[in-house]
A protein has these predicted regions:
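Short, surface-exposed terminal/edge motifs of secreted or surface/virion proteins that either
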Residues: 31-35, 55-113
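Residue-level detector of intrinsically disordered, flexible termini
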Residues: 48, 73, 91, 118-119
């Protein structure tokens, strides 16, 4: 196994050189995925000057750097985009919708309230 099963964090191999690189990559992913907040899931064009640690859910019509990464998480780290394939159960707060979404394995769905009070919570 070269990555963890839930968050796909890279594991350090026995005898691996430059262990700090793998360790730092895992920390970057962990920092992004824990309490995941994305700016949007409908913005097809990557921002021209994204802030470090910006995150987006790439829509199907993504262009530029987002092209070919539909439904992936796009994380801007170290001056470039890192694309992660979501796993079932991952949750994200989508800022421009003010809603939680959950990856079902095939799509991002708005999380449903579990209370009989519905959206009142």
């Amino acid at each position: 196994m070269s990555a963890t099963p839930r968050l796909a964090l890279p594991l350090i191999a026995a005898g691996q050189a430059q262990k700090h690189v793998t360790h730092n990559e895992a920390l970057v992913r962990l920092d992004a995925l824990l309490h995941l907040v994305v700016a949007s899931r409908t913005q097809a064009v990557p921002p021209a000057a994204p802030d470090e640690a910006s995150a987006y859910i790439v829509p199907a019509d993504g262009t530029g750097a987002f092209a070919g990464h539909a439904e992936a998480l796009a994380l801007f780290e170290d001056g470039g985009w890192l694309f992660l394939t979501p796993r079932p159960g991952w949750q994200a707060w989508v800022v421009d919708e003010a809603q939680h979404h959950v990856w079902t394995g095939t799509q991002w769905r708005r999380a449903q309230p579990e209370s009989s009070l519905g959206a009142a919570l």
